[in-house]
C-alpha cells in the first residue's frame, strides 16, 4: 500500500543551490528547452474546447490537459504513465507540466531583441559602436549598412540610403556587401573579434587624453569584456528562434455564454505567428523585395511588442483599445512578478478583524474570537480529533468542526494553549508592527488588544483592523515565542526607549493620583504603613492628593552577594508624600526606590520610570510593573472622574488690553507707511511681528491664569497652588493636548497662512470659546484643508523613502563578533549656539570604545578599548567630565559583506550587544522611515516673518570657566583699543578647571571681543558683540587710503539717503554699465605708508589690496588716514538673497540621495594661501597657492559671499565661499568621518525639530551603504578598468589576491552614491531588478552573465530560501559546513578505494549535491 501511495506522491526533491546566474540564451539553447514548434496561431477549438494541434495550446507540445489522460482518450489512468499516444501524440503525464514545458517559433527572418536595442544605453549600439538611430534605421528597413567594403573606398558599418546603395552598386558592382534588417546587424555582430577589440580599446585608453573619449572607451570596454568573460556571443542579441511561454502561464479560460477571457500574451504570440507564417509563404513564392521587406519589418515590430509593448512606436492594442500587456510588463512595476508575487505573497492560516481594547489582558496576551481561532487552527483540531478517536477520518473530523460540537471547543482550548499567534497592523513601518501573543479565546468577533502595545503598533480603536497569522512549525513557534512575544519587545529599536509607555487615560489617572494639594482632607497625618493609608482612604478620612507622612517598605538590592543570600532585602523609611503616591508604592518592583514615584507622574516621568525599571530590575519585573501601572492608571482615572466643560477654558482677563495695544501699534506703522517712512515690505514684516508677539503674550497670560489657583492653607492664609483645572491637567500630564491647542481654545488663534505659505497680516483675535465670525472661519479653512492634503502626500512620500532605505540596506547583516579594527570616530557632545543639543552620554551609550577611556585626573584606564559602554559607564564618563570618546562605528567596520557586532554596539531593541545574524540594515531603514510621516513636507521661506528668530548680535557664556580661542581665531586692536575679529572661522571655547571644553561659540568676522584668551569668567558674561545688520570690511594694516577702480557711474554709484541727506558710495555690478574696458576691474583699496609707498603684506612682496564686493557701502574717503581695525566699508546683510531652507521629509530624502545642492558652498581643494586673481565677466577669480607653490584657481560668481581674504591661510576642505555644503566635496576633501558627521547631524536636525529620537548608528549604517562602492584610480594588475565603480568588498578581495600573487593592487577613491543609485548598483541583480528599472537591470545582467550569490535578504525571499539573517544565517552556515565535510569524506573514500585496488587514482568526479 505504502509503495502505491509513494507512486502518487512523487515528491520532487527541491534543488539546493547557492547562486543564480542569468545570461543570454543561444538559439540552440532555446530549441533545447522547447518541446516542439508552434506553427499555427490557433488556440483552442471553440466548439469542442480542445486545443488545436500545433497551435498555441497544443497538447502534443505542452502536455495533457487532464492528469494522466491523452487528448483523444485512448490512454487513461496511471498505469500508462509516460506512454505517448500514437493517435494524438500526447504524452500521458501530469497536467501541471503545462506550466513548465516551453515551445518555440522558428523565425523566418532574424529579429533584434528590443531590450538590447532600446534599453539605454543601447547594448547593440555599444558593441557595434554605432548610434542607436543608425541601428534602428537598418533594423526597420530604412537604410543599408555596409558589411564588407571589399576593395571600395566605403567603410564597414557605413549607413546609406536606398538611393545611395543603388548608385554605389552601379559604381562598384558586387565588390562590396551591404544589407538591411536584422540579418545585416547579425552579420556585423558575427564579424566582431572581441579579444582584438578589447586589446585595442585598452591601448587606446592608455594613450588618449580627452575626457569624453576615455568615458566612451571605458563604457564600450566594459560591455565587450563582459561578453568576453561570460562566453556569450554578441549575435545572440538577435533572435532566430522565439521561445513560447508554457500555456498555463498565459491561460485562456472559457466564460459562460461562449466568450473567453485570455491573457494578452496569446494575442501578441498570435500576431507573431501570423506574420511569421506569411513571411515564410512570401519567401517561398519569391515575392518582390519590397513586399518581403515590409513583412520582415512587421515581424520585427510584432516581436518587439511581445517582448516589450510600447517601448518603440505606438503600443499594440487589443479589441478594447487598451495597450496589451507584454512580457516586460509582466515583471516590472508594483503589479509585476517581483513586487506582487515574489516579495508580496499572501499567506495561509491568517485572518483579520477589527480590534477592540482588552484592558484585562496581560501584556503577552491577545483576545482571539472563538470563530476565528476555530478556522485558523482547523488542521490541528482535525489531528487532535483523530488522535482522541472522536472522529475516524478527516472527513468526519471536518463535520464535527462544522457542527461546532462541545468537544470541539474543548479541543480548541487545548490546541491553542502555549501556541502563540502573530498580530500585524498595516502599515508595518518597523519591526514592532508584527508581534506575537498568546491567544485567549473570547466571545464576539473582534480581536482584543492590550492597550500598552498600541504605541508600537500605532493602533487606536476607532475602527482599525489587524491581521492574525499562525506560526505552524515548532521552530516557527519557538521563534515567535522567544523573539517576537510582545513582552520581549519592550524597547523601540530606533532609540532604545520603552515602547510600552502608558498614554492618555492611564497617564491622566497616574498624574491625578500623584499630584499634591494644599490643605487636603487629613493633611499632616502620619501612618505606620501603606495598608493603613488605604484603609483611611477607603473610609474617606483622607483625599488622594493630601500630604501625609508614611512609613514605606522598599526592597533594595542586597549588599551581601554570597551564596543563598536573598537578592533583595526590605528597608523601611519614613517619607513625606501624598496618599495617592503611597498607595501606588504597592506596585513598585523590588530594586526600585520609592523616590521614583514620589513626584507628580507626567508622561515623560513615567517613560523614565519604566526605563529605569528595565535597566535596574530586568525585563520580567518591568513588564509586570507596566501592566500594574496600566491597571492602576485606568482605575484611578475612572475614580477621578475628570471631565471638561466650556468654563474650564479660562480666557485671560488681560486679553482685551494686549490686543488693543497691538492694534494701536499696527495703526502707527500704517501711518508711517502712508507718510513714506517705511516700505511696504517693512510695514508688513513689522505688522506680522507685532501680531505673532501678541499671540504669544495672550497665550502666556492665559497659561499663567490657567496653571495656578488660589487656595486657603492650613493656617488660614491665602496662597496659590498648581491648578486642578481639567484642561490644564490634561496638557500638563502629557495625556492630551498642548499649550498651543489650549491657546486656540482660550487665548487667540493668531496668524493664519495663505495657500502659498505667506502669512495673512490680519490675525484671528478670537478663540474657539468666544467663537469665530464668518471671515475668521473662512480664513482658517485654508490651513485645515492644506493639512489634510499634506498628510496624504506625506504618507506616500514617507513610504517611498522607507522603501528606498530598506532596499539600500537590506543585505547588511551582523556576520561576526569582531572585525578587529582599531578605527572609530571621536564623539563629542553636540553643541549649537552654546546650547547642548545632545549630550555626550546619549551619543556613546551602547557603543563599543575604540580606544581606552582614561580618567583625565588620574590618567588611569577606566574602560579598555573593546568595552561596551553601558549606563554605568556613561554616567562615570559624564561625572568625570570627559568630553571626547572614540567609539567604534559601522562606518569603519572592516567586515566584508556585512558588519561585526563590536562596530555596531548595542541592539537598542534588546538592550544588550547585538547578536550575530541581526539584520541591522533593515532595522536602520525602518527606524529612519517609520517617523517619516511625522515630518513636515514644507520648505521654509526665510524672509517675511514666518519663523524668523531674532537675529543674534552677541554671544554670552552659559557656564563659569576660562575663555580659550581656537587656532583659527585672529584679531587686531583698533585705535579705541577694542579687539576686532578678522578671522572667518574663529571660535571661542569655555573650558573648566581641568581644561575640558564646556561650550563653544562661533565668533563672526568684524565682531568686537569683550573677553580675551585666558580670561576667567562667570556664566552670563558677554564674550563678543557685533552689528547684526551689516557685515564690515576691516583693514588689518594702517596707512593712507588709495582708491583703485573706484569710478562713479562705472563701479560705484552715489546714493543719497532720503532722510538724512548724506551721500555714500555703493559698489555696483560692472556689467550694468556698458564700458567694455571696465569688465575686469574691481573696486579696491591700497594703503600707502608715510613715504607714499604701497604697504606690503609682511614677509611677502604682495601689496595689500582690499577688494569691495558688489553692494558694499564704502565708508572711507580717498586719501583718508586709517588705523588698524578700522572699517572701510559695510555690506548690508538684508541685501543678501534669502535662502529657502528645505525642511522635513524632502530634506531627509535630499541628504540620503546625496544630491549636490545648487549654489553649493566651495571648499578649498588644497591647503595654502589665498589671493585674488584677475576678474572675468561676472566672476571673481580666487587663487590658492599650495605649499609646493602650485596654483589652484576657482571662479566665483560676484554675488557670492567669499569667506576668506587676501593672504589668509586655509586648510584643505575649509569653506571658502558661503553656501550649503556639498556632501561629495566633504567626502573628497575631508574624508569619511567628516561626511558621516555632516549627514548624521543634518538628518538629526530635521528629526529633532519634530521631537523624534533616532539613534545615530542607524544613520551611520545608511551612510556605510551609500559608501559601499569605490572608484578605481589606478587598476594595477587587477581586472578592473580605471574610472570603473566597483563594490568595495569586491575590490578588497581582488587586492588581497593580487598581494598574495605579488602583483600590483588597485588604488581607489571613495565615492558617495545616493540611496536609489546605491540600490540599483548592488551586486545582486535580483535585488536591483525588484527595486526599480527592472528591464534595464536585467538587460545589463544578462549581457554580463551575472551571478547572484544570494547574499542579501531580498534575493533569498524572492527565490524562496531562508533569509541569511537570524536563525537563517546559522542554518546556511551549518549547511555549507556539512556540504564541505561531505565533499571531503567523498574525496577520502575515493582515494582509499583507489589505493586499495592499487590503481593510479583516477580524478574523483565532483559529486552532485547529495540529496538532503
Curated annotation (Swiss-Prot):
Q: Which GO terms label this protein's molecular function in UniProt? A: DNA binding; DNA-directed RNA polymerase activity; magnesium ion binding; zinc ion binding
| Record-linked Gene3D superfamilies | 1.10.132.30, 1.10.150.390, 1.10.1790.20, 1.10.40.90, 2.40.40.20, 2.40.50.100, RNA polymerase II, clamp domain, RNA polymerase Rpb1, domain 3
Q: Matching SMART domains, A to Z? A: RPOLA_N
Annotated region Disordered: the residues are 1392-1412
In the UniProt record, the signal sequence range is none
Where Mg(2+) binds, per the record, is at 460, 462, 464
Cofactor, free-text remark: Binds 1 Mg(2+) ion per subunit. Binds 2 Zn(2+) ions per subunit.
Q: What Pfam families does the annotation carry?
A: RNA_pol_Rpb1_1, RNA_pol_Rpb1_2, RNA_pol_Rpb1_3, RNA_pol_Rpb1_4, RNA_pol_Rpb1_5
Q: Which residues bind Zn(2+) 1?
A: 70, 72, 85, 88
Iron found in the keyword field: no
Q: Which InterPro entries match?
A: DNA-dir_RpoC_beta_prime, DNA-dir_RpoC_beta_prime_bact, RNA_pol_asu, RNA_pol_N, RNA_pol_Rpb1_1, RNA_pol_Rpb1_3, RNA_pol_Rpb1_3_sf, RNA_pol_Rpb1_4
Into which EC class is this enzyme placed? transferase
Keywords, in A-Z order: DNA-directed RNA polymerase, Magnesium, Metal-binding, Nucleotidyltransferase, Transcription, Transferase, Zinc
Ligand binding (Zn(2+) 2)? 819, 893, 900, 903
Q: What is its EC number?
A: 2.7.7.6
Q: Which GO terms describe its cellular component?
A: DNA-directed RNA polymerase complex
Q: Which GO terms describe its biological process?
A: DNA-templated transcription
Question: Which cofactors must be present for this protein to function?
Answer: Mg(2+); Zn(2+)
The family note in this entry says:
Belongs to the RNA polymerase beta' chain family.
Role noted for this protein: DNA-dependent RNA polymerase catalyzes the transcription of DNA into RNA using the four ribonucleoside triphosphates as substrates.
What interactions and quaternary structure are annotated? The RNAP catalytic core consists of 2 alpha, 1 beta, 1 beta' and 1 omega subunit. When a sigma factor is associated with the core the holoenzyme is formed, which can initiate transcription.
Q: What is this protein called?
A: DNA-directed RNA polymerase subunit beta'
Species assigned in the record: Burkholderia mallei (strain NCTC 10247)
The gene name reads: rpoC
Amino acid at each position: 500500500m505504502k509503495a502505491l501511495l509513494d507512486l502518487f506522491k512523487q515528491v520532487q526533491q527541491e534543488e539546493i543551490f547557492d547562486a543564480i546566474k542569468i545570461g543570454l540564451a543561444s538559439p540552440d539553447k532555446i530549441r533545447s528547452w522547447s518541446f516542439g514548434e508552434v506553427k499555427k496561431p490557433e488556440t483552442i477549438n471553440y466548439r469542442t474546447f480542445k486545443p488545436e494541434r500545433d497551435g498555441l495550446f497544443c497538447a502534443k507540445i505542452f502536455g495533457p490537459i487532464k492528469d494522466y489522460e491523452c487528448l483523444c482518450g485512448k490512454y487513461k489512468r496511471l498505469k500508462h504513465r509516460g506512454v505517448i499516444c500514437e493517435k494524438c501524440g500526447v504524452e500521458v503525464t501530469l497536467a501541471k507540466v503545462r506550466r513548465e514545458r516551453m515551445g518555440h517559433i522558428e523565425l523566418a527572418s532574424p529579429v533584434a531583441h528590443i531590450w538590447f536595442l532600446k534599453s539605454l544605453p543601447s547594448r547593440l549600439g555599444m558593441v557595434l559602436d554605432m548610434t542607436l538611430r543608425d541601428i534602428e534605421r537598418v533594423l526597420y528597413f530604412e537604410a543599408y549598412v555596409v558589411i564588407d567594403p571589399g576593395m571600395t573606398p566605403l567603410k564597414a558599418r557605413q549607413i546609406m540610403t536606398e538611393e545611395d546603395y543603388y548608385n554605389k552598386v552601379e559604381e562598384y558592382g558586387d565588390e562590396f556587401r551591404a544589407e538591411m534588417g536584422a540579418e545585416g546587424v547579425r552579420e556585423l555582430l558575427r564579424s566582431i573579434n572581441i579579444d582584438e577589440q578589447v586589446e585595442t580599446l585598452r591601448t587606446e585608453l592608455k594613450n588618449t587624453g580627452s575626457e569624453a573619449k576615455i568615458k566612451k572607451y571605458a563604457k564600450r570596454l566594459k560591455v565587450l569584456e563582459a561578453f568576453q568573460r561570460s562566453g556569450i556571443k554578441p549575435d545572440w542579441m538577435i533572435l532566430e528562434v522565439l521561445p513560447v511561454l508554457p500555456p498555463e502561464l498565459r491561460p485562456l479560460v472559457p466564460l459562460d455564454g461562449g466568450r473567453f477571457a485570455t491573457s494578452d500574451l496569446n494575442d501578441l504570440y498570435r500576431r507573431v505567428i501570423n506574420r511569421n507564417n506569411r513571411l515564410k509563404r512570401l519567401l517561398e513564392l519569391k515575392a518582390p523585395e519590397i513586399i518581403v521587406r515590409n513583412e520582415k519589418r512587421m515581424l520585427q515590430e510584432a516581436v518587439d511588442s511581445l517582448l516589450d509593448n510600447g517601448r518603440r512606436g505606438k503600443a499594440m492594442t487589443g479589441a478594447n483599445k487598451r495597450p496589451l500587456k507584454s512580457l516586460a510588463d509582466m515583471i516590472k512595476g508594483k503589479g509585476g512578478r517581483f513586487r506582487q508575487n515574489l516579495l508580496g505573497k499572501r499567506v495561509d492560516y491568517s485572518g483579520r478583524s477589527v480590534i477592540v481594547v482588552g484592558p484585562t489582558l496581560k501584556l503577552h496576551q491577545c483576545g482571539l474570537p472563538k470563530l476565528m481561532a476555530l478556522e485558523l487552527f482547523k488542521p490541528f483540531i482535525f489531528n487532535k480529533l483523530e488522535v482522541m478517536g472522536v472522529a475516524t477520518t478527516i472527513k468526519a473530523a471536518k463535520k464535527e468542526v462544522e457542527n461546532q460540537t462541545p468537544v470541539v471547543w474543548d479541543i480548541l482550548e487545548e490546541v491553542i494553549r502555549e501556541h502563540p499567534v502573530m498580530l500585524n497592523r498595516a502599515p508595518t513601518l518597523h519591526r514592532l508592527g508584527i508581534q506575537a501573543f498568546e491567544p485567549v479565546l473570547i466571545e464576539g468577533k473582534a480581536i482584543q488588544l492590550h492597550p500598552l502595545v498600541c504605541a508600537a503598533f500605532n493602533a487606536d480603536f476607532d475602527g482599525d483592523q489587524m491581521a492574525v497569522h499562525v506560526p505552524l512549525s515548532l521552530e516557527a513557534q519557538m521563534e515567535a515565542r522567544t523573539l517576537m512575544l510582545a513582552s520581549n519587545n519592550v524597547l523601540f529599536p530606533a532609540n532604545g526607549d520603552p515602547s510600552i509607555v502608558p498614554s492618555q487615560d492611564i497617564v491622566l489617572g497616574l498624574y491625578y493620583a500623584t499630584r499634591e494639594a494644599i490643605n487636603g482632607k487629613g493633611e499632616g497625618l502620619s501612618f505606620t504603613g501603606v495598608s493603613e493609608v488605604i484603609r483611611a482612604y477607603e473610609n474617606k478620612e483622607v483625599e488622594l492628593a493630601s500630604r501625609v507622612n508614611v512609613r514605606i517598605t522598599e526592597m533594595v538590592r542586597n549588599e551581601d552577594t554570597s551564596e543563598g543570600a536573598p537578592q533583595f532585602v526590605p528597608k523601611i523609611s519614613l517619607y513625606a508624600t501624598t496618599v495617592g503616591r503611597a498607595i501606588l508604592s504597592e506596585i513598585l518592583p523590588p530594586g526600585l526606590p520609592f523616590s521614583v514615584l514620589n513626584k507628580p507622574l507626567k508622561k515623560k516621568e513615567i517613560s523614565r520610570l519604566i526605563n529605569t525599571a528595565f535597566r535596574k530590575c530586568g525585563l520580567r519585573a518591568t513588564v509586570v510593573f507596566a501592566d500594574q501601572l496600566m491597571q492602576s492608571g485606568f482605575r484611578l482615572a475612572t475614580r477621578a472622574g475628570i471631565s471638561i466643560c466650556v468654563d474650564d477654558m479660562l480666557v485671560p482677563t488681560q486679553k482685551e488690553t494686549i490686543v488693543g495695544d497691538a492694534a494701536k501699534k499696527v495703526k502707527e506703522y500704517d501711518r508711517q507707511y502712508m507718510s513714506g517712512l517705511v516700505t511696504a515690505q517693512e510695514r508688513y514684516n513689522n505688522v506680522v511681528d507685532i501680531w505673532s508677539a501678541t499671540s504669544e503674550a495672550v497665550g502666556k497670560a492665559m497659561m499663567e491664569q490657567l496653571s495656578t489657583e488660589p487656595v486657603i492653607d492650613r493656617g488660614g492664609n491665602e496662597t496659590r497652588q498648581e491648578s486642578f483645572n481639567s484642561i490644564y491637567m490634561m496638557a500638563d500630564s502629557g495625556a492630551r493636548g498642548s499649550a498651543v491647542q489650549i491657546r486656540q481654545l482660550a487665548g487667540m488663534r493668531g496668524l493664519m497662512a495663505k495657500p502659498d505659505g505667506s502669512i495673512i497680516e490680519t490675525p484671528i483675535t478670537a478663540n474657539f470659546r468666544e467663537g469665530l465670525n464668518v471671515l475668521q472661519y473662512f480664513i482658517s479653512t485654508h490651513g485645515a484643508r492644506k493639512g489634510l492634503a499634506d498628510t496624504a502626500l506625506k504618507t506616500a512620500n514617507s513610504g517611498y523613502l522607507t522603501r528606498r532605505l530598506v532596499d539600500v540596506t537590506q543585505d547588511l547583516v551582523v556576520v561576526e563578533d569582531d572585525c578587529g579594527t582599531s578605527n572609530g570616530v571621536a564623539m563629542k557632545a553636540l553643541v549649537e549656539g552654546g546650547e547642548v543639543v545632545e549630550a555626550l552620554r546619549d551619543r556613546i551609550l551602547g557603543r563599543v570604545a575604540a580606544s581606552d577611556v582614561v580618567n583625565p585626573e588620574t590618567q588611569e584606564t577606566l574602560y579598555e578599548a573593546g568595552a561596551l559602554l553601558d549606563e554605568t559607564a556613561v554616567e562615570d564618563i559624564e561625572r568625570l567630565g570627559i568630553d571626547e570618546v572614540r567609539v567604534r562605528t559601522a562606518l569603519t567596520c572592516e567586515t566584508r559583506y556585512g558588519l561585526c557586532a563590536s562596530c555596531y554596539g548595542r541592539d537598542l531593541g534588546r538592550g544588550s550587544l547585538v547578536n550575530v545574524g541581526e539584520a541591522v540594515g533593515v532595522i536602520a531603514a525602518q527606524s529612519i522611515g517609520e517617523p517619516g510621516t511625522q515630518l513636515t513636507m514644507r520648505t521654509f521661506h526665510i524672509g517675511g516673518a514666518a519663523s524668523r528668530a531674532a537675529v543674534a548680535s552677541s554671544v554670552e557664556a552659559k557656564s563659569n570657566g576660562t575663555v580659550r580661542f581656537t587656532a583659527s581665531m585672529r584679531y587686531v586692536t583698533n585705535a579705541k583699543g577694542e579687539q576686532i575679529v578678522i578671522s572667518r572661522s574663529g571660535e571661542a571655547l569655555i573650558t573648566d578647571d581641568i581644561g575640558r571644553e564646556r561650550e563653544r561659540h562661533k565668533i563672526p568676522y568684524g565682531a568686537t571681543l569683550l573677553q580675551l584668551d585666558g580670561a576667567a569668567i562667570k556664566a552670563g558674561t558677554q564674550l563678543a558683540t557685533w552689528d547684526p545688520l551689516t557685515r564690515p570690511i576691516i583693514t588689518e594694516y594702517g596707512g593712507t587710503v588709495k582708491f583703485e577702480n573706484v569710478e562713479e557711474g562705472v563701479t560705484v554709484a552715489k546714493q543719497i539717503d532720503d532722510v538724512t541727506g548724506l551721500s555714500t558710495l555703493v559698489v555696483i555690478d560692472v556689467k550694468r554699465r556698458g564700458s567694455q574696458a571696465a569688465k575686469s576691474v574691481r573696486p579696491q583699496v591700497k594703503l600707502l605708508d608715510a613715504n607714499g609707498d604701497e604697504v606690503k603684506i609682511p614677509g611677502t612682496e604682495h601689496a595689500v589690496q582690499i577688494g569691495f564686493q558688489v553692494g558694499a557701502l564704502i565708508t572711507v574717503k580717498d586719501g583718508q588716514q586709517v588705523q588698524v581695525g578700522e572699517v572701510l566699508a559695510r555690506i548690508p546683510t538684508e541685501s543678501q538673497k534669502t535662502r529657502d531652507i528645505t525642511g522635513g521629509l524632502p530634506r531627509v530624502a535630499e541628504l540620503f540621495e546625496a544630491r549636490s545642492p545648487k549654489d553649493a558652498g566651495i571648499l578649498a581643494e588644497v591647503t595654502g594661501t589665498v589671493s585674488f586673481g584677475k576678474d572675468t565677466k561676472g566672476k571673481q577669480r580666487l587663487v590658492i597657492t599650495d605649499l609646493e607653490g602650485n596654483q589652484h584657481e576657482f571662479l566665483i560668481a560676484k554675488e557670492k559671499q567669499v569667506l576668506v581674504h587676501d593672504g589668509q591661510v586655509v586648510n584643505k576642505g575649509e569653506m571658502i565661499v558661503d553656501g550649503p555644503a556639498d556632501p561629495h566635496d566633504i567626502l573628497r576633501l575631508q574624508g569619511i568621518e567628516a561626511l558621516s558627521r555632516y549627514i548624521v547631524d543634518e538628518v538629526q536636525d530635521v528629526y529633532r525639530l519634530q521631537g523624534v529620537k533616532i539613534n545615530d548608528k542607524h544613520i551611520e549604517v545608511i551612510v556605510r551603504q551609500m559608501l559601499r562602492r569605490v572608484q578605481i584610480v589606478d587598476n594595477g594588475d587587477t581586472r578592473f578598468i580605471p574610472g570603473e565603480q566597483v563594490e568595495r568588498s569586491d575590490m578588497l578581495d581582488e587586492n588581497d589576491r593580487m598581494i598574495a600573487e605579488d602583483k600590483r593592487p588597485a588604488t581607489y577613491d571613495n565615492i558617495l552614491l545616493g540611496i536609489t543609485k546605491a540600490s540599483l548598483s548592488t551586486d545582486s541583480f535580483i535585488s536591483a531588478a525588484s527595486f526599480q528599472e527592472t528591464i534595464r537591470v536585467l538587460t545589463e545582467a544578462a549581457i554580463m552573465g551575472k551571478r547572484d550569490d544570494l547574499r542579501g535578504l531580498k534575493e533569498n525571499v524572492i527565490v524562496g530560501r531562508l533569509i541569511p539573517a537570524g536563525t537563517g544565517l546559522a542554518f546556511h552556515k551549518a549547511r555549507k559546513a556539512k556540504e564541505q565535510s561531505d565533499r571531503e569524506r567523498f574525496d577520502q573514500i575515493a582515494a582509499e578505494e583507489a589505493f586499495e585496488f592499487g590503481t593510479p587514482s583516477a580524478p574523483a568526479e565532483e559529486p552532485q549535491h547529495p540529496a538532503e
